[in-house]
Amino acid sequence: MASGEKSRMLFERTKELFPGGVNSPVRAAVKPYPFYVKRGEGAYLYTVDGARIVDLVLAYGPLILGHKHPRVLEAVEEALARGWLYGAPGEAEVLLAEKILGYVKRGGMIRFVNSGTEATMTAIRLARGYTGRDLILKFDGCYHGSHDAVLVAAGSAAAHYGVPTSAGVPEAVARLTLVTPYNDVEALERVFAEYGDRIAGVIVEPVIANAGVIPPRREFLAALQRLSRESGALLILDEVVTGFRLGLEGAQGYFNIEGDIIVLGKIIGGGFPVGAVAGSREVMSLLTPQGKVFNAGTFNAHPITMAAGLATLKALEEEPVYSVSREAAKALEEAASEVLDRTGLPYTINRVESMMQLFIGVEEVSNAAQARKADKKFYVKLHEEMLRRGVFIAPSNLEAVFTGLPHQGEALEIAVEGLRSSLKTVLGS
């Protein structure tokens, strides 16, 4: 078992220290208590209880190279030897910015921050500052962090104004965010017909990664781009997950769509805290100190993060990361399909390159409402069975399975067999 006596004792201590015993809610979803990690290397996590686990979570997306990749480790050690915080610019942020912009916004500009939440918050403020408008449009099931403007769900069917999904978010703030279904062109057109001249920005995950994995319909993306441009709203592509995972050009290159503002995180930090906002010079020049849209941060463009991110992107350019990751996810998809096809049980597997999720009890998942109808109890049992077999998938089917460079050879064999045998066990229970 991944969680043993040492993990249990640590959890008893942390329950007295942290709300719910953890510092991010999803970590508490591993039952009966989280396993505590001693170290990570390659495809594996090693727990304080002596278990070795194949990691198909990869820190919820950032570690596409796996744990402790040699080039990232070397870059971080070299950066640490030079000092780890200056309060002044360094060369690494210049090199990383040039590399990122070359792929996601040629000729544009970028601002580094410290998390995806900070990045989406800054992007929304920037869209409002640029357009002079007040409303933001988001989509049901898309996750954009933990600030007030995006902790919002759809209200009554008669209105598009959002309602808070968290205590502490004022209703007046939530009403500045419109919410409509993902992948629904007709609903999108209705929102723009009614509110188009007030919408500052449309923020969207090109592939939903926090209601399971839900790929976009191409006509939906095309409508997003067309309606945003026609109305004068800025299209904000939240590529915190998809950026540098679907390819070097992210979802923009993969789906042939262009955002006005691109939000990045996760992979570009190489496993260290990071976020970024990229856009045209016209839009980005509004950020302080050049313009009047405020953003600042002691840890923005942190030297260690910049070094890790630069090493990661170089590895993505030079190593077979995308092909290996894709084939690993494909192998998992095929193993699950092989077992489930024999049962007659309705299911669907959504996979986009190296991110995927399995939904039991539904034959299609193209929006969050359909994802929520999937059999959650089945998935939790699957998660638990796989953990018993030394394979870690997210504890909720509203998260994603991620594969990366180290998921090959023995690690992939363990993962595939763990999935296959776990499915058979759950189906037989």
From Swiss-Prot:
Q: State the Gene Ontology BP annotations.
A: protoporphyrinogen IX biosynthetic process
The superkingdom of the source organism is: Archaea
Q: Which CDD domains match?
A: OAT_like (cd00610)
- Residues with the modification N6-(pyridoxal phosphate)lysine, per the entry, are 266
Output a single Gene Ontology CC term carried by this record. Answer: cytoplasm
Q: Which cofactor does it need?
A: pyridoxal 5'-phosphate
What molecular functions are annotated in GO for this chain? glutamate-1-semialdehyde 2,1-aminomutase activity; pyridoxal phosphate binding; transaminase activity
The record ties this protein, via PANTHER family, to: GLUTAMATE-1-SEMIALDEHYDE 2,1-AMINOMUTASE, GLUTAMATE-1-SEMIALDEHYDE 2,1-AMINOMUTASE 1, CHLOROPLASTIC-RELATED
Q: Which family does it belong to?
A: Belongs to the class-III pyridoxal-phosphate-dependent aminotransferase family. HemL subfamily.
The name on file for this protein is Glutamate-1-semialdehyde 2,1-aminomutase
Q: Which organism is it from?
A: Aeropyrum pernix (strain ATCC 700893 / DSM 11879 / JCM 9820 / NBRC 100138 / K1)
